[in-house]
């Protein structure tokens, strides 16, 4: 039914990937992408035989928008789940916006070098303009 790209392969990512694989009727294909592809491959091997979900892996630098865009254009996911570092949220969001791919996140972006809340309003507007943003929770906050 859907193709999910999961960016990150640390502790939180491993739990999220296991849970997604338990729902193979929803997530029929998953790509695990991280800077350390050997971790992705090891998790894929561990999961094979326990799920009907088709799992692929890839190496990606989550700080590099062009690399993220290229991977998204190649894999064509329906959605991206970001379980990488919170400092990488905006580059991953930029790539999703460029590709028109839905974005999910388990963390809250924290600018590494600044305390500027303006970024949130800017990205919410961009997502609404691309019809990728459907939550009313931010409007109520």
Named regions from a protein language model:
Residues 133-141:
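Single conserved hydrophobic/aromatic residue that forms the stacking wall/gate
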Residues 51-63:
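Rossmann-fold cofactor-recognition segment
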Residues 62-74:
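Conserved Rossmann-fold cofactor-binding substructure of NAD(P)-dependent oxidoreductases
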Residues 61-62, 78-93, 100:
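N-terminal glycine-rich "phosphate-gripper" loop used for MgATP/nucleotide binding
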Residues 6-10:
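Conserved N-terminal Rossmann-fold NAD(P)-binding element of oxidoreductases
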Residues 108-132:
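Rossmann-fold NAD(P)-binding glycine/threonine-rich loop
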Residues 36-38:
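Helix N-cap at the beta1-alpha1 junction of Rossmann-like dinucleotide-binding domains, i.e.
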Residues 13-14:
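N-terminal Rossmann-fold NAD(P) dinucleotide-binding loop
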């Amino acid at each position: 039914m859907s193709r999910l790209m999961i960016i990150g392969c640390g502790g939180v990512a491993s739990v999220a990937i296991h849970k997604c694989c338990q729902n193979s009727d929803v997530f029929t294909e998953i790509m695990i992408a991280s800077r350390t592809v050997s971790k992705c491959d090891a998790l894929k091997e561990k999961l094979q035989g326990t799920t009907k979900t088709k799992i692929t892996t890839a190496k990606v630098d989550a700080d590099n928008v062009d690399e993220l865009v290229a991977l998204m254009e190649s894999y064509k996911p329906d959605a991206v789940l970001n379980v990488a570092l919170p400092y990488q949220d905006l580059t991953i969001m930029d790539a999703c916006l460029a590709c028109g791919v839905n974005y999910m996140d388990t963390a809250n972006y924290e600018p590494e070098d600044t305390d500027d809340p303006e970024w949130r309003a800017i990205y919410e507007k961009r997502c609404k303009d691309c019809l990728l943003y459907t939550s009313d929770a931010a409007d109520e906050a």
